[in-house]
Amino acid sequence: MTDMLTGTRRARVERKTKESDIVVDLDLDGTGIVDIRTGVPFFDHMLTSLGSHASFDLTVHATGDIEIEGHHTVEDTAIVLGQALGQALGDKKGIRRFGDAFIPMDETLAHAAVDVSGRPYFVHTGEPDYMVEFTIAGSSAPYHTVINRHVFESLAFNARIALHVRTIYGRDPHHITEAQYKAVARALRQAVELDPRVTGVPSTKGSL
């Protein structure tokens, strides 16, 4: 939530289930300082990219049943990250609200668009069919690219934002995945940024 005395937009969210134990600290007005430890190396890499390119200060410490499969840890972390984002936004006064970004990564081009609307919605298009079955190896737990959709959907619904993510073209599953995360990061950076010309909530209804 927004601290009325300091103006900082921060949140700390903890979530513990039988499958995972997750703590997320988020500062929307940070400088891209990140500390990510989920036990799934490629997911750590993606969240590091997200925090860095959004210029958020982001700490994620997660443990889970990765000896079975990393899915629970990854999806549950996205849930908590979305909750932290929603809380940190507070009343949403003064934000730009909308953001979008095109991100190229070698042969891949991805696009993300965000509306901090308070109406959760998610659209995910363009990934090649083989992404459903592809696995990116890791030293402790692999990352299955089929979960990309679940990550962004969980983030959107728990942050209560509208998020559209599309792969315009691409071939390498690593590049496709990373370009999507970076596009989401840059779109979020725009959308949550404070606009000096906006003093209230950026909605004709007066609330988001």
UniProtKB/Swiss-Prot annotation:
Its EC number is 4.2.1.19. One of its GO terms (biological process) is L-histidine biosynthetic process. The keyword Lyase applies. The keyword Amino-acid biosynthesis applies. Its main location: cytoplasm. Pathway: Amino-acid biosynthesis; L-histidine biosynthesis; L-histidine from 5-phospho-alpha-D-ribose 1-diphosphate: step 6/9. It is an enzyme of class 4 (lyase). GO terms for cellular component: cytoplasm. It comes from the Bacteria. One of its GO terms (molecular function) is imidazoleglycerol-phosphate dehydratase activity. It is found in: Cytoplasm. Pfam families: IGPD (PF00475). Belongs to the imidazoleglycerol-phosphate dehydratase family. NCBIfam families: PRK00951.1-6, PRK00951.2-1, PRK00951.2-4. This is Imidazoleglycerol-phosphate dehydratase.
